[in-house]
Design a protein with these regions (language model features):
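Short, small-residue-biased leader/transition segments that mark boundaries at the very start
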Residues: 1-6
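Non-heme di-metal
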Residues: 10-205
């Protein structure tokens, strides 16, 4: 099965050790970056919830879980021992949801456009093609994260999180009630949860 393919791939790659390579440092650097992003997004989710943005809170939480998986893939290539790295990380504050989205989008942009392509090139140079491929594939996910954050930034800036130009179908995240109109109901008539729980209905199945 697929699991065996991955195990075999890892065995083949790990015939060559990452110990002492630039790739080893890059793996640890990006593991730390993904781990910190996961924590920041968890904090940002709490703020979004408090500010009445249930969908944005859920997206921050979902993205945090995805960063956890990226971190795990990176960590699994490492071989133990202590490794010293020099890297810069956001020593930022927890802001408003708009500020948090902007911070998150900028971080994702840096990863997919600069950091991970660079790490992939180094991995290729050092003879770790599977690690290079991992970085390039994770960069695709990070680009998707950035685009999603930018869409929410636009919604907040144009006050269109719960109101749209034309009629749309809104769905309550709590109970599934469906409503068609330009603006989400102030209160869900079915479960009495506030407007915060409404989002534009998605059909992706």
């Amino acid at each position: 099965g697929l699991g065996d393919v991955y195990k075999r791939q890892k065995k083949e790659t790990m015939a060559k050790s990452v110990k002492g390579t630039r790739t080893e440092k890059n793996l640890l650097t990006s593991f730390a970056g993904e781990s910190q992003a996961r924590m920041r997004y968890t904090y940002f989710a709490s703020v979004a919830k408090k500010e009445g943005y249930e969908q944005i809170a859920a997206i921050f939480t979902e993205t945090a879980d995805q960063e956890k998986e990226h971190a795990k893939r990176m960590f699994k290539w490492l071989e133990g021992g202590m490794v010293e790295i020099t890297a810069s990380y956001p020593a930022g504050v927890i802001g408003t949801t708009l500020e948090n989205l902007q911070e998150a989008a900028a971080g994702e942009h840096g990863e997919w456009s600069l950091d991970y392509p660079g790490f992939a090139d180094v991995a290729d140079e050092e003879g770790f093609p599977e690690i290079a491929l991992m970085y390039r594939n994770i960069a695709i996910a990070e680009k998707g994260h950035e685009e999603r954050y930018r869409a929410f930034i636009k919604n907040i800036e144009t006050a269109s999180v719960f109101a749209k130009e034309g009629e749309v179908v809104w769905q309550c995240r709590n109970c599934g009630f469906i409503y068609t109109g330009k603006e989400a109901p102030q209160v869900c008539p079915a479960c009495l949860h506030p407007q915060a729980y409404f989002e534009v209905k998605k059909e992706n199945y």
